[in-house]
């Protein structure tokens, strides 16, 4: 799968990323390869004058490791980002709907993506599903003090929310925005409706269901790179 991630990352950058772009940079293992290749293109002079908008502290670290400058403050943001390049945990191709947030960064990922003209998703073949939610849980970022209320409300809906923890630390995982993550297993028949519905609950800041109006998916399947 690592080779697939590398190939789709290189394809996406070669075909869609141009000099002088405002570019959102997502989070995750596939984006790692995109950053490495982006670094090569910048060093060779093939890509120049990029303004990069990272979506997480992990991404900032990887960019800094490659000596790539990025926008640390968005106070001068005056135009939509041209493209955000990112990965996904699940992809429903027919609706170009996604589940994201395995890296606990989907709040900022969605802010950057939904302020971009295009969301460019890169993925290996394991991320393609027939029903959204069939492999992974849906992450929901919440205000910490709202945990008991949101948990109770979700349980009334017959869901089983699980507070995300980490074996390397005590207590729940804390996001870059100092919030908690609830992982909720569900099969999603109406991705757009589900995205809107759950955000009506007070205390829910963002849900990891993505329905960007201009999504391009570049994925590896049956021995070749495909796009839709």
Swiss-Prot record:
EC code(s) of this entry: 5.3.1.6
Origin: domain of life: Bacteria
Annotated Gene Ontology cellular component terms: cytosol
Pathway: Carbohydrate degradation; pentose phosphate pathway; D-ribose 5-phosphate from D-ribulose 5-phosphate (non-oxidative stage): step 1/1
Keyword GTP-binding among record annotations: no
Annotated keywords: Isomerase
GO BP annotations listed: D-ribose metabolic process; pentose-phosphate shunt, non-oxidative branch
Database matches in SUPFAM superfamilies: D-ribose-5-phosphate isomerase (RpiA), lid domain, NagB/RpiA/CoA transferase-like
Pfam families, per database record: Rib_5-P_isom_A
Catalytic residues identified in the record: 109
PANTHER family registered for this protein in UniProt: RIBOSE-5-PHOSPHATE ISOMERASE (PTHR11934:SF0)
Similarity comment: family membership: Belongs to the ribose 5-phosphate isomerase family.
Functional note: Catalyzes the reversible conversion of ribose-5-phosphate to ribulose 5-phosphate.
Record text on subunit structure and interactions: Homodimer.
Record-linked HAMAP family: Rib_5P_isom_A (MF_00170)
Name of the molecule in the record: Ribose-5-phosphate isomerase A
Gene label: rpiA
């Amino acid at each position: 799968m690592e080779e697939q991630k590398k190939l789709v990352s290189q394809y996406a950058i070669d075909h869609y990323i141009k000099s002088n772009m405002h570019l959102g940079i997502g989070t995750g293992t596939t984006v790692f390869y995109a950053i490495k290749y982006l670094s090569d293109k910048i060093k060779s002079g093939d890509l120049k004058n990029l303004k990069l908008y990272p979506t997480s502290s992990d991404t900032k670290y990887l960019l800094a490791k490659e000596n790539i400058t990025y926008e640390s403050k968005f106070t001068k943001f005056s135009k939509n980002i041209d493209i955000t390049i990112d990965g996904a945990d699940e992809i429903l191709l027919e609706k170009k709907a996604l589940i994201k947030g395995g890296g606990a960064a989907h709040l900022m990922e969605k802010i950057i993506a939904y302020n971009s003209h295009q969301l460019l998703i890169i993925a290996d073949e394991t991320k393609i599903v027939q029903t959204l939610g069939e492999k992974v849980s849906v992450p929901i970022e919440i205000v910490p003090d709202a945990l008991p209320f949101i948990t109770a409300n979700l349980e009334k809906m017959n869901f089983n929310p699980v507070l995300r923890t980490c074996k390397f630390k005590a207590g729940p995982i804390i996001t870059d925005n100092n919030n908690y993550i609830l992982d909720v297993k569900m099969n999603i028949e109406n991705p757009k409706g589900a995205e809107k519905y759950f955000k009506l609950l007070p205390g829910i800041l963002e849900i990891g269901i993505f329905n960007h109006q201009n999504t391009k998916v570049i994925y590896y399947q049956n021995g070749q790179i495909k796009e839709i």
